């Protein structure tokens, strides 16, 4: 539907009127080349139009990135930069390292090993890209650990709040996350954990 939103801006407004307030948008890089491995026409330039049309309709975007080693892993930093620069239209990216299952039965073991990418790779690649500003050991934690923060935020809003915070009760090995805060005026950012002495 990203391509349709780019071609038909009114579709985004119709979706908003029907109650849609957030979408997941496949986002494998900040260039057409980094999106070309999907062999579809909804490349980066089309996604940019879709992002603008969704934002104009008041729909928030979560960019979803399938990271494949040797294909678009060099894009994880630029994707973060893009999301920060467009924070008024989208949230942080949801990186999903490639998983070879199901319909990927024809993938050879050599290709599987060559293209494998894990959340640990992601944490270290972002640390290198940002010269250590994101620490792979200090700043990353299991997704489910944010549930306590979500519960606290819900409690602070009180029982009259319209909608609660998102929480994830998944297995600790299911995924990892890092939280950042950014100054909308200056664009400066820091990881939340960098404000604390964890020692």
Would you name each region that the model predicts?
Residues 1-97:
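Radical SAM/AdoMet-radical enzyme domain recognition
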Residues 52, 56-199:
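Radical SAM enzyme [4Fe-4S]-AdoMet core and its adjacent flexible, acidic
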């Amino acid at each position: 539907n990203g391509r349709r939103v780019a071609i038909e801006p009114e579709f985004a407004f119709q979706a908003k009127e029907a109650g849609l307030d957030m979408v997941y948008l496949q986002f494998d890089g900040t260039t057409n080349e980094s999106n070309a491995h999907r062999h579809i026409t909804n490349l980066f330039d089309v996604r940019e139009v879709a992002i603008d049309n969704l934002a104009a309709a008041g729909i928030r975007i979560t960019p979803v990135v399938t990271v494949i080693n040797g294909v678009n892993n060099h894009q994880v930093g630029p994707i973060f930069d893009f999301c920060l620069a467009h924070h008024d239209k989208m949230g942080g990216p949801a990186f999903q390292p490639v998983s070879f299952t199901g319909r990927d039965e024809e993938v050879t073991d050599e290709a599987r090993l060559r293209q494998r990418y894990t959340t640990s790779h992601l944490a270290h690649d972002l640390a290198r890209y940002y010269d250590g500003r994101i620490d792979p050991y200090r700043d990353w934690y299991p997704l489910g650990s944010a549930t306590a923060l979500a519960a606290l935020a819900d409690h602070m809003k009180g029982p009259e709040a319209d909608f609660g915070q998102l929480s994830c009760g998944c297995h600790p090995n299911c995924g990892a996350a890092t939280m950042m805060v950014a100054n909308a005026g200056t664009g400066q950012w820091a990881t939340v954990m960098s404000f604390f002495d964890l020692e």
